[in-house]
Amino acid sequence: MKNYSKNATHLITVLLFSFVVILLIIPSKCEAVSNDMQPLEARSADLIPEPRYIIDVPPRCPPGSKFIKNRCRVIVP
């Protein structure tokens, strides 16, 4: 008879522990789902830092050419 009560105590302990774990996991899963359901603009606004000033630097041209009107042009001597 003692063996049955020990098994029952162990079973109840395992069930209580799993119940507590489930209670801890479910709210975090729901929060993740609610974050996924937000519009893309709302989520990306949190991730993107403030815009930095972009300096328009012309591309480098090979030797013997210059950057003229958005293209590298070969200068004929």
Swiss-Prot record:
Protein keywords: Disulfide bond, Secreted, Signal
Compartments in which it is found: Secreted
Prosequence residues removed at maturation: 33-52
Entry superkingdom: Eukaryota
GO cellular component: extracellular region
Tissues in which the UniProt entry reports expression: Expressed by the venom gland.
Signal sequence, start to end: 1-32
Cytoplasm listed as a keyword: no
Disulphides: 61-72
UniProt keyword annotation of Nucleotide-binding present: no
InterPro entries: Secapin (IPR020128)
Function per UniProt: Nontoxic peptide.
Family as reported in the entry's similarity comment: Belongs to the secapin family.
Protein name from the UniProt record: Secapin
Organism, scientific name: Vespa velutina nigrithorax (Hornet)
